[in-house]
Curated annotation (Swiss-Prot):
Known pathway: Quinol/quinone metabolism; 1,4-dihydroxy-2-naphthoate biosynthesis; 1,4-dihydroxy-2-naphthoate from chorismate: step 2/7; Quinol/quinone metabolism; menaquinone biosynthesis
Cofactors that this protein relies on: Mg(2+); Mn(2+); thiamine diphosphate
Coiled-coil segments on the chain, per record: none
Database matches in PANTHER family: 2-SUCCINYL-5-ENOLPYRUVYL-6-HYDROXY-3-CYCLOHEXENE-1-CARBOXYLATE SYNTHASE (PTHR42916), PROTEIN PHYLLO, CHLOROPLASTIC (PTHR42916:SF1)
Protein name (database record): 2-succinyl-5-enolpyruvyl-6-hydroxy-3-cyclohexene-1-carboxylate synthase
Enzyme class: transferase
EC number per UniProt: 2.2.1.9
Pfam families from the UniProt entry: TPP_enzyme_C, TPP_enzyme_M_2, TPP_enzyme_N
Keywords: Magnesium, Manganese, Menaquinone biosynthesis, Metal-binding, Thiamine pyrophosphate, Transferase
Gene3D superfamilies assigned: 3.40.50.970, TPP-binding domain (3.40.50.1220)
UniProt xrefs under CDD domains: TPP_PYR_MenD (cd07037), TPP_SHCHC_synthase (cd02009)
Family statement drawn from the similarity comment of this UniProt entry: Belongs to the TPP enzyme family. MenD subfamily.
Single GO term (MF): manganese ion binding
Length: 571
């Protein structure tokens, strides 16, 4: 059998195996060593191919696409540093629990570690940041090779999509020549199915948890960012049964489209009210129940650490014990819909006055936040008004740093159906533009990106993807000329070197970038302009709204809001 036929059979078996296990999307970056597999992907009707020349941005694009679809997305690149450029997004996918199938083309084994060009040590390149890694055989025509491909790709996708989701790495060596014969049909498959099952809690664990909850006098629940594809109906029913205060982080997506009968239990202003020592003294808990990831607010976590409740129970699909407080007493590793159906709640011991204290504080803080958005002119007020302007049925991708914190502060419970997403696995500001672009590709809802100026600059390369596929996205850039979050941190009290090291102003404006990428552009200088300018930017698929704010005014206005709420809670 010829080398060309061996290679053709090999790569089409790979593509057929991916299609067999439900892969629909592949993000490809150009390169020579990945030629055979890239040709096979491009010629397969069952696969949608996306292109991005920058591998770092390509990986974040794939991350966003996987977030939107809750399905595994394949990344394909050539050998060498191309594969290394995937690393930041792989780290984020690992901690954010996003399924990626990373395929790195490689030199054949005889060219490794001998100084061959564009060759690095690629097997197991990503270390502990992938759930599984395997080095594939060459397309040598040996009888075991094609069955190996079928089973290992099925295994890779099963691992990536088992709880917790995460990335896997397939390193695939190709020997020259690299051209194949293009095929119209995929080969027949012999391996049919691979599944990893669900995480079901033990009966004893559920009995113990039921006992803890039913004996609690004072307790609250926290819902953080949840696993992709989580059905919120289970959680809403649990809220109705539990009847406790429920602290809902914005990324839980339980602040929007809220069922009316669940509204009395929701606490959305927890970050503001947790700054009050008087309020914290009133609501010392016996029990804290946390579902999903740790919330954005450090103040609620500091409160738990300091109070050390008798029971701090974490229920999560991730077995890595995500508890930075160090005071958890129970960890239950299970799928959310599984543990809920096993609980028996009576609530006989719970004190309704405890819920009333949370309700009173939340209502007070909500009133001040509503007033703030009407009278202030800073970034927070801008965000609050944008949340009212963005139409029902939209999704908002939010950058780390100040945007995600402002969403957490200013998003109150609403009947509007708006969902929020972010890269909070490792909380970085890198790759956010690309992630949002990928997210918009996998999403049939209108999509917005809320981002700061430095995070936008960090991933301007991500916009290259818009030259290869039409992207429907409105980018809202809060341009405060630097790193606004540091103004809230102790570093801001030391004037020497502050601007050089932390403020890092660039004095850049983004109209020329918008022009370069054929984006609709509007500039907003004042809050009075916001409504009219925002509604006017609808002409092109890709839109940029640049909103100018002042870092010093932002931090002053935020602190005045917190001080007003604190003073009222003290009274």
């Amino acid at each position: 059998m010829s080398e060309r036929k061996n290679l053709t059979d090999y790569v089409y078996k790979m593509v057929a195996s991916l299609v067999q296990v439900g892969v629909e999307n592949v993000v490809v970056s150009p390169g020579s060593r990945s030629t055979p597999l890239a040709y096979a992907v491009a010629s397969t009707k069952q696969i949608k191919m996306y292109r991005q020349v920058d591998e770092r941005s390509a990986a974040f694009f794939a991350l966003g696409l996987a977030k939107a679809t809750a399905k595994p997305v394949v990344l394909l690149c050539t050998s060498g540093t191309a594969a290394a450029n995937y690393f930041p997004a792989i780290v984020e996918a690992s901690y954010a629990r996003v399924p990626l199938i990373i395929i790195t083309a490689d030199r054949p084994h005889e060219l490794r570690e001998v100084g061959a060009p564009q060759t690095i040590n690629q097997p197991h390149l990503y270390g502990s940041h992938v759930k599984w890694s395997v080095d594939f055989p060459l397309a040598d025509g040996a009888a075991p090779t094609l069955p190996f491909i079928e089973r290992h790709i099925a295994r890779a996708v099963a691992i990536a999509t088992s709880a917790p989701f995460g990335p896997v790495h397939l390193n695939v060596p190709f020997r020259e020549p690299l051209l194949i014969d293009l095929q119209d049909e995929l080969p027949t498959m012999t391996f049919k199915h691979s599944s990893m099952g669900q995480l079901i809690p033990t009966t004893s664990a559920m009995q113990e948890l039921s006992s803890i909850l039913n004996s609690t006098r004072k307790g609250f629940m926290i819902v953080g960012e949840l696993a992709l594809g989580t059905d919120l109906a289970f959680l809403w029913e649990f809220v109705r049964q539990l009847k406790w205060p429920v602290i809902v982080e914005s990324l839980s997506n339980m602040r929007a489209a809220v069922p009316e009968d669940c509204l009395p239990y929701l606490v959305t202003t927890y970050d503001a009210i947790m700054k009050s020592e008087d309020f914290k003294a009133l609501v010392q808990p016996d029990t804290v129940l946390r579902i999903g990831a740790q919330p954005v607010s450090k103040f609620i976590m500091q409160f738990i650490t300091k109070t050390q409740p008798s029971a701090y129970v974490i229920i999560d699909e991730d077995p890595m014990f995500r508890d930075a407080t160090g005071v958890s007493t129970h960890f239950i590793h299970a799928n959310i819909d599984q543990w809920l159906t096993h609980l028996t709640l009576t609530n006989t011991a719970f004190e309704e006055s405890y819920l009333a204290e949370w309700q009173k504080a939340n209502q007070l803080a909500s009133t001040y936040i509503e007033q703030y958005s009407e009278i202030e002119k800073d970034e927070g007020a801008m965000v609050s008004r944008l949340l009212k302007m963005i139409p029902d049925g939209s999704d908002i991708f939010v950058s780390s740093s100040m945007p995600v914190r402002d969403i957490d502060t200013f998003l109150l419970a609403t009947p509007k159906d708006i969902r929020f997403f972010a890269n909070r696995g490792t909380n970085g500001i890198d790759g956010v533009v690309s992630t949002a672009l990928g997210f918009s590709q996998g999403n049939d809802r209108e999509t917005y990106l809320l981002i700061g100026d430095l995070a936008f600059l960090h991933d301007v390369n991500g916009l290259i993807a818009t030259r290869y596929q039409e992207c429907n996205l409105t980018i809202l850039v809060m341009n405060n000329d630097g790193g606004g979050i540091f103004s809230y941190l102790p570093q801001s009290t030391v004037e020497a070197h502050y601007e050089d090291l932390f403020g890092t102003p660039t004095a850049l404006e983004f109209q020329d970038i918008a022009h370069m990428y054929n984006m609709d552009y509007v500039r907003v200088d004042t809050i009075a302009e916001l409504s009219g300018k925002f509604s006017s930017v609808k002409k092109r698929p890709l839109r940029l709204v640049e909103i100018f704010t002042d870092r010093a005014e932002n931090v002053q206005a935020h602190r005045e809001l917190w001080n007003r709420i604190n003073a009222e809670l003290k009274a």
